[in-house]
């Protein structure tokens, strides 16, 4: 097998996020520590202290969030972890916060439709990623002494067979160029969700309304595609 393009050019992003309107109103909040020092901005849904939303039980990111919460001293800073119960409820908590213009702080990932609908700022963990620490402790249920760490990076590539690489010709030329930033994918997923569209509908919407694909094909193919649209 061979790697072609890194299809998510921003990688698959995971981490802790806050609404963009909170970030805009509080430009001093750039890191996880900054947010944890502003418990007043992130009310707990039960009205007692501040909240940080983790992943639902059974998701590995819950272990990582819980361990990083301990590493950064979240409880001592007035926060309690909220388990949303499901991926849908986690997304719903973001939508509800946006609807009320309230603070929200917690785990999410990109690209996703939710981040296409509700602009969010990913916060820095303000330390380099330590992969050994991540594998031995940050991501483990029995992590006794978690240390500060940055979230692991998830690279996402298109992979092709040896035969495809050797025989596909212009198909391979296309595959090695096809990559999109997460903001574009977020927006496309949000459009697809809002319009209850099919994958084919979303592809046509992309071709008609975005220009990233222009660099994936030669000028002749581009002209034919535009004429067909």
Predicted regions and their residues:
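A conserved helix-loop-strand patch within extracytoplasmic ligand-binding domains
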Residues: 1-53
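Soluble non-cytosolic domains of exported or imported proteins
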Residues: 10, 25-29, 56-60, 84-88, ...
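A bilobed periplasmic-binding-protein/Venus flytrap-type ligand-binding module shared by bacterial periplasmic
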Residues: 13-25, 154-167, 190-191
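Extracytoplasmic/secreted envelope proteins and their assembly/folding machinery
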Residues: 32, 36, 62, 66, ...
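Sec-exported extracytoplasmic/periplasmic mature domains
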Residues: 37-41, 70-74, 95-99, 176-180, ...
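Ligand-binding pocket segment of bilobal, Venus flytrap-like solute-binding proteins
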Residues: 53-134
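C-terminal lobe and pocket-closing loops
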Residues: 114-179
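C-terminal functional modules
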Residues: 164, 172-229
């Amino acid at each position: 097998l061979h790697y072609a393009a890194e299809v998510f050019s921003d990688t698959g992003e995971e981490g802790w996020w806050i609404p963009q309107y909170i970030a805009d109103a509080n430009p001093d909040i750039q890191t996880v520590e900054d947010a944890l020092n502003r418990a007043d901005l992130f009310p707990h849904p039960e009205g007692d202290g501040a909240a940080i939303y983790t992943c639902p039980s059974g998701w590995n990111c819950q272990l990582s969030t819980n361990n990083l919460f301990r590493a950064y001293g979240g409880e001592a800073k007035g926060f309690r972890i909220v388990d949303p119960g499901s991926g849908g409820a986690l997304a719903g908590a973001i939508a509800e916060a946006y609807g009320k213009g309230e603070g929200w702080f917690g785990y999410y990932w990109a690209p996703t439709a939710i981040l296409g609908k509700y602009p969010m700022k990913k916060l820095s963990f303000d330390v380099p990623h330590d992969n050994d620490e991540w594998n031995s402790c940050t991501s483990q249920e029995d992590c006794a002494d978690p240390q500060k760490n940055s979230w692991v990076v998830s690279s996402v590539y298109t992979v092709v067979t040896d035969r495809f690489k050797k025989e596909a010709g212009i198909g391979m030329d296309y595959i090695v160029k096809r990559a999109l930033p997460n903001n574009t994918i977020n927006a496309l997923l949000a459009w697809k969700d809002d319009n209850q569209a099919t994958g084919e509908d979303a592809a046509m919407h992309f071709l008609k309304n975005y220009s990233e694909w222009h660099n994936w094909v030669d000028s002749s193919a581009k002209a034919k595609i535009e004429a067909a649209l």
